[in-house]
UniProtKB/Swiss-Prot annotation:
GO terms for molecular function: ATP binding; ATP-dependent protein folding chaperone. The keyword Signal does not apply. The keyword Flavoprotein does not apply. Its main location: plastid. This is Stromal 70 kDa heat shock-related protein, chloroplastic. It is found in: Plastid, Chloroplast stroma. Keywords: ATP-binding, Chloroplast, Nucleotide-binding, Plastid, Stress response.
């Protein structure tokens, strides 16, 4: 089972995926997490 979490903030947003039982923030093309 794969889990993805999305935080839709008013200024920034973030996406995390579960890897090995720990959440990992997905970075954009510039390497930023927002």
């Amino acid at each position: 089972q794969k889990v993805v979490g999305i935080d839709l903030g008013t200024t920034n947003s973030a996406v995390a995926a579960m890897e090995g039982g720990k959440p990992t923030i997905v970075t954009n093309a510039e390497g930023q997490r927002t």
